[in-house]
């Protein structure tokens, strides 16, 4: 599938078949996802892949029992055979931008309270995690599978601890991967007009 076709075909899938996905394909998709832009070539993004029964760890910590029992979409989402968790390391970027060739940026310095993150108007670590997640979504689409991105809303620290993630890493979001089961209900959000064309692209001036 050509890139333009993958971009235009990509949709968030919220109902999956439980059929397993080839682990070699998952590895290839993640390797491609890690080829995205990386500020200062820091490479401070990583993925934790949960497959089969291991996906329950994600749902247990990132959602609540009330939500799981009441959300109409939960059964379809929870059938996704792969849950890939996008992680990023703020410390990796803070250290990288404190090195000699980046020190002039001022992004590796601390404020009066010793907070090194306050110098960053837009933290690069979240941007790089987003680039990687988008590449994974596009790669999954190009492979003929369905995918959905779920943000980090709750349970971040317990989830990281349960997975043995080293201290200092942040959970950015989860990409669900699997075959579509044909039972997805279109999101009401799709009724909103797309942000394309003259309304969203401005030349020379807003």
Q: Model-derived features: where do they sit?
A:
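Short amphipathic alpha-helical segments
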Residues: 1, 23-32, 56
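C-terminal helix-cap and adjacent tail motif
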Residues: 3-13, 88, 92, 172-206
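Small-aliphatic-rich amphipathic alpha-helix that forms the alpha element of a beta-alpha
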Residues: 33-34, 84, 105-162
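A short N-terminal beta-strand-loop micro-motif at the entrance of redox/enzyme domains
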Residues: 12-28
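Glycine-rich, charged/polar anion/phosphate-binding loops
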Residues: 31-35, 67-71, 159-161, 184
């Amino acid at each position: 599938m050509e890139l333009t076709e993958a971009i235009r075909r990509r949709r968030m899938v919220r109902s999956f078949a439980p059929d397993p996905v080839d682990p070699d394909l998952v590895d290839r998709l993640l390797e491609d996802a890690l080829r995205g832009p990386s500020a200062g070539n820091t490479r401070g993004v990583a993925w934790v892949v949960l497959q089969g029964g291991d996906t329950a760890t994600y749902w247990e910590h990132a959602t609540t029992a009330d939500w799981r029992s009441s959300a109409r979409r939960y059964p379809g989402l929870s059938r996704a055979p792969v849950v890939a968790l996008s992680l990023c390391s703020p410390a990796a970027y803070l250290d990288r931008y404190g090195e000699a060739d980046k020190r002039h940026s001022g992004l590796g310095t601390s404020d009066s309270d010793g907070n090194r993150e306050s110098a960053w108007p837009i933290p690069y670590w979240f941007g790089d995690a987003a680039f990687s997640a988008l590449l994974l979504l596009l790669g999954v689409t190009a492979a003929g599978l369905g995918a959905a991105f779920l943000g980090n809303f709750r349970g971040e620290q317990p989830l990281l601890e349960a997975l043995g993630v080293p201290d200092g890493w942040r959970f950015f979001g989860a990409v669900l991967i699997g075959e579509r089961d044909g039972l997805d209900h279109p999101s009401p959000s799709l009724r909103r007009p797309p942000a394309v064309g003259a309304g969203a692209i401005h030349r020379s001036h807003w």
